[in-house]
Amino acid sequence: TLELESEPMTKHLQENAYIQMLLYARINRASVANMVAWAEKADLDNLVANWNVERLVVQQGDDSATPPIPTIMESDAALRERALLAWDALSVAGPREAYRYHARTADGAVMDAEPTSPSPGVVDVYILAATGDGTPSAELLTKVADYLTDEDRVPLTDNVHVKAAQVLPYTLAIRLFIPAAGPSAATITAEAERRLLEVINPRRRIGVEVPRSLLESALHAPGVRKVELTDWADITPAKHQAAWCSRYTIEQVIQ
């Protein structure tokens, strides 16, 4: 009887199964909303508030400007990372992660911070901005310095200097070899470009390397036969440097 779609009992069982599925989905969503690794948006805001961490403003909006300037808030990924650093900020000994947390909390315009100690009692904190090529303004450096040198945040024995990270701009000249027979070359190239941006944007950090293998792997989207990077040399920034892709070009070679 249940094999018949017209059987009322079959419809009743399907309805009950669907209701159960919705219930389990709701339970799963509520569960992940209480996990830092998976919580998003307002759920993440409420979760990290338990650690006295709040979402920062990256760019102040101005509706009176022409054109209007939108308000840009800290991303979920950045807030999640900073919230995890908050535990290190509880230390009064001045560990590296505590300096990173305080520097990034000073202003939402700080994308990354890297502290180093060139000599005993001296701490250099390099700052990378979230806007432009990453070079911080003098105002941003001053704001971070004032925040970091507060006696309630850093050890009195530390002499803190806030400096701008050195930005290493680079360009990418990419050749994608795509078979003539197959999906649209434009579709394949668009997917390769999307995958490229997914790997170069997160690597816009202080001291993070940009190797050839990473780029080629990302560009090998389905349908790409071969990838060539013209005149490429791996970029290995020091602890005070950050790589930044200023421009990239993608050439299609249909074969």
Give the location of each predicted region.
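N-terminal polar alpha-helical/low-complexity "assembly arms" that mediate subunit docking
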Residues: 1-92, 185-255
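Carbohydrate-recognition loop of C-type lectin domains
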Residues: 88-208
